[in-house]
Amino acid sequence: LYVCINCNYHFRMSAENRIKMFFEDGDYNEIIPDKISDDPLKFTDKKKYKDRLKEYRKKTNRDDAFILIKGKIKDKEIISGLMNFEFMGGSMGRAVGGAIVKGAKIAIENKLPYVIVTSSGGARMQEGIVSLMQMPRTIAAVDLLNENNIPYIVVLTEPTTGGVTASFAMLGLSLIHISEPTRPNN
């Protein structure tokens, strides 16, 4: 499970490998998040944000940093969202926020537990305030889960920082938090 047997070092696990581990019987279907327009701010640093998105989409074969799934673990159906650190450090922008909200809505509609696995550097700087707006959006979605008595479980993996930590991952709204050990600095 990505742990060194000699020194107990915990290696980072990809979102794809987590999916295989969670749904070991392969009993799952990905839910396609709603499409949104790229680059609402026309952001450019060393390269255009649109170009950076294209680069990461090609590299990861994913549209963004969140994978939404409906599947079964030991015959129990769940909705699961996994942050993909390989896509721009798992940063949360509009697409990630929208996918988290969509997952919450599906969990409520189907009365299924919602399990999120975090792995994120925080809010996506290329989206500025639009990215920061995802914090209250995701908090409201988790609050709706609680109002509807839907189990909400957060698995905190290394790293989980910034706006993700300050919003849906750690605000005490979840019923269960599970945390992996952090990796020591080398």
Name the predicted role of every residue range.
Residues 1-153, 159, 171:
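Terminal-region recognition feature
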Residues 157-167:
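Gly/Ser-rich catalytic serine loop of serine hydrolases
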Residues 176-186:
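Single conserved hydrophobic/aromatic residue that forms the stacking wall/gate
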